[in-house]
Amino acid sequence: MRIVVLTGGIGGARFLLGVRAYAQEVGAEVTAVVNVGDDLRLHGLRVCPDLDSVMYTLGGGADPERGWGRTGETWTVKDELAAYGAEPGWFGLGDKDLATHLVRTTMLDAGYPLHQVTEALATRWQPGVRLLPATNDRLETHVIVSARSELASPAATNNASTVSARSELASPAATNNAAAADGFGGGQQAIHFQEWWVRHRAQLPTHRFVFVGAEAAKPAPGVTEAIAEADVVLIAPSNPAVSITPILAVAGVREAVTTGPAPVVGVSPIIGGAPVRGMADRCLAVVGVECSAAGVGQLYGARAAGGLLDGWLVAEEDAQTVIPQVTVRAAPLRMTDEAATVAMVRAAVEMA
């Protein structure tokens, strides 16, 4: 059996622990296609938060308290940067984590594509699944917010290290909005998703998400091939708006999923009307989707009607969920330990 998982970072990484354990039970192969929309360049280094969260979690090196970064992390470099007044102070890189970014950036600068760099990094961590970035190309999630003077300050935009490329975002192709060609119009501006999420805690007046580079991005080698050869495609219980949608925005990925032979089963990230973790409710509000299992299921839609899903696994609290032309099943979805997560994965695979 071949299993493909479309996934984001922290929640998706925990889900993949269960997928890996299930795969070992049944002798399956697993490929994880990971979101890169959160990626940014910081202090000259390429940082891939979701890829690293998955790699560290599956490799046994993730911090269980924070849910991100490395266990036993230290912050000497962060403190030294702060002493120099280097921005951004709101996004810290731990000393151990920095080693990953240094190796990644060195390899990228030497000409290696991201999927090969990821494979090389994974040789240390032995995640037990194949990790693929959704694309090797530039793809960043930017957020269109109401303009505020503090957002335009050098500190907020990280000086020369900022990843907000307003000239690119200002094009109609990048924003799918002709008004954006003139500085977004109506007092709007773009900031990187990480600034919106980490610094501002998703509290700014927000208009939409833009996946910069998606139209030109190509799937990383192996992505569409894995989907075409899969026996089942699972959509992890990751943030639908900013973890799963950027993957599907890469040209050719959505088509590979919707036209491929494998059944597509999604797992709801919403239990009883609330996110399992994080601020997915705020992201869903930006895209006009109700924070519920039904809302997310309808966002993905039925494959038979041009959407993604053949099956939708929801929590027992949401057993009455109905998605037209999609098989809906309820099961315990709290990933309290590996056994619970394996049972959840098994329930999803059995829907295929």
Outline where the language-model segments fall.
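Active-site glycine-rich loop that binds ribose-phosphate moieties when present
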Residues: H207-I227
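Extreme N-terminal starter segment of soluble prokaryotic enzymes
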Residues: M1-I3
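C-terminal functional extensions of proteins
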Residues: R277-A352
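A short, Lys/Arg-enriched amphipathic alpha-helix followed by its capping loop at the start of a domain
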Residues: F15-A28
